[in-house]
């Protein structure tokens, strides 16, 4: 079978060959420097004892989980450190589809292709739900699309690719819709530091055992190659993610 190169690769090649500045909106690589404290800590880590280079607990290094829990104001037991936010999303999506509560995944359109791919990989059925013209959540469209076959609703805020920041009350309404059809809601907040208004509200502010929040440090700290992410899960779903 002959491999067909994706068309956007050609677009990237055109951009690289252009004789002017081209804004790369493909991979999400930050163009700023990692924090100086991080560089210093990495240099110091090289001299740590051998034991510090071995497997950590499957749910992540305890000190890191504790720091994440403090920042997100959640119980440490709910935090699972992952291989980037991608794995965090995968764990959350897998858990939602593993409950025998349907196989449909509602994705807001336009959607970052990752979520479509992972839905297919997990044998889920993707359904694209249109957003408002400005990229905001269309709660009524979500309500119309949701059914007893819906296992999961995926939200990404601040959003890739539109840049929309979803209103917390709209997210809360989606969580209520999910509860009515026994679905979970996964909210990917990896771009939370990109809300330059300084008023971003996390879905963790919603008191619900339906909400899974994922995030990471790739974007905010400019360390995409380190692959450090995490998920905050409702208590009933933590054990499955840790194993």
Per-range role (PLM):
Residues 75-80, 102-104, 149, 209-210:
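Short acidic capping loops at alpha-helix termini that bridge into adjacent secondary structure
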Residues 212-243:
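Conserved core segment of the aminotransferase class I/II
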Residues 133-195:
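Active-site phosphate-binding strand-loop segment of PLP-dependent enzymes
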Residues 18, 122, 177-181:
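Helix C-cap/helix->beta junction micro-motif
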Residues 11, 115, 174:
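Aromatic/hydrophobic pocket-lining residues that form π-stacking "cages" and hydrophobic walls in ligand
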Residues 2-89:
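N-terminal small-domain helix-loop-helix segment of the aminotransferase-like
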Residues 77, 95-119:
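Conserved PLP-anchoring active-site segment centered on the Schiff-base-forming lysine
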């Amino acid at each position: 079978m002959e491999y067909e190169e994706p068309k956007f690769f050609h677009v990237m090649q055109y951009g690289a060959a252009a004789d002017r500045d081209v804004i790369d909106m493909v991979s999400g690589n930050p163009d700023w420097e990692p924090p100086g404290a991080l560089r210093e800590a990495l240099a110091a880590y090289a001299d740590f004892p051998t034991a510090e280079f071995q497997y950590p607990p499957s749910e992540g290094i305890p000190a890191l989980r504790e720091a994440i829990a403090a920042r997100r104001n959640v119980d440490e037991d709910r935090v699972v450190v992952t291989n980037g936010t991608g794995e965090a999303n995968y764990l959350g999506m897998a858990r939602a589809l593993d409950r025998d509560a349907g196989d449909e995944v509602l994705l807001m359109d336009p959607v970052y292709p990752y979520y479509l791919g992972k839905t297919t990989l997990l044998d889920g059925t993707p359904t694209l739900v249109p957003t408002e013209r400005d990229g905001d959540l269309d709660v009524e469209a979500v309500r119309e699309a949701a059914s007893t076959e819906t296992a999961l609703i995926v939200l990404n805020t601040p959003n890739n690719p539109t840049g929309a920041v979803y209103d917390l009350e709209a997210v809360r309404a989606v969580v209520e819709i999910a509860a009515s059809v026994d679905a979970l809601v996964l909210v990917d907040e990896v771009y939370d530091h990109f809300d330059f208004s300084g008023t971003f509200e996390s879905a963790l502010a919603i008191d619900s055992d339906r909400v899974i929040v994922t995030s990471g440090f790739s974007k905010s700290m400019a360390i995409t190659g380190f692959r450090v992410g995490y998920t905050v899960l409702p208590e009933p779903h933590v054990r499955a993610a840790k194993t």
